[in-house]
A protein has these predicted regions:
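Conserved glycine-bearing catalytic or ligand-binding loops at nucleotide- and phosphate-handling centers
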Residues: 3-20
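Thiamine diphosphate
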Residues: 19-192
Length: 192
């Protein structure tokens, strides 16, 4: 089960699905416009179940699944400016889970925030269950999951809907600050 963060990743996922012959495979086809990235001349398939690190940081791991990656990058920039260094990772796969990536992120950070366009019981819950089964939560590692709430969201502009759902950069920043007990009024948060 794959979820693309942008049009290049979507192309790679389509190629992966076309070449995969060992069972069922699926990917989420995102709604809306592409980001306008320059497409490579040659599209390569993905290694099944492997995510990627987009940016390395030290304190916070932002683990994204799907198209919220640009909001994750904006949140990372804001948090970095506050002295809260962030790693950004693109999970790419909800299943199979990249357990090596998750282990590395949990070992090298104080907090992990998962961001997905799924509902409760989805990718974030899968990550949380893995961390619990491995005993990683026993030593105080912190994790928060951001996902679509189980409420009716009024149809409209996609950015407004994501803001209402709490899947925007501002809410990612607020979630991090709340975990660390930082009063957001101490910082000027620039809205994106």
């Amino acid at each position: 089960v794959m979820a693309a963060s942008n049009e290049i990743e979507l192309s790679r996922m389509v190629k992966t699905a076309a070449e995969y012959n060992s069972g069922p495979i699926s990917f989420r086809y995102p709604r809306g416009n592409a980001f306008g990235l320059d497409m490579p001349e040659r599209i390569e398939a993905l290694k099944i179940g492997k995510g990627k690190i987009i940016k390395k940081g030290e304190k916070i791991a932002l683990l994204n699944l799907g198209t919220r990656i640009e909001e994750v990058k904006k949140a990372s920039d804001i948090l970095d400016s506050m002295g809260l260094s962030c790693t950004i990772a693109d999970a790419r796969f909800a299943k199979p889970l990249d357990t090596e990536l998750i282990k590395d992120l949990s070992k090298n950070h104080e907090l992990m925030i998962t961001i997905e366009e799924g509902s409760s019981g989805g990718f974030g819950a899968h990550v949380l269950m893995h961390l619990a089964e491995q005993g990683i939560l026993d030593d105080g590692f912190k994790i928060r999951n951001l996902y679509l709430p189980d409420i009716f969201i009024q149809q409209g502009d996609a950015s407004d809907m994501y803001a209402q759902a709490g899947l925007n950069s501002e809410n990612i920043v607020k979630t991090v600050l709340k975990v660390f007990g930082i009063n957001k009024s101490e910082f000027k948060i620039i809205k994106s």
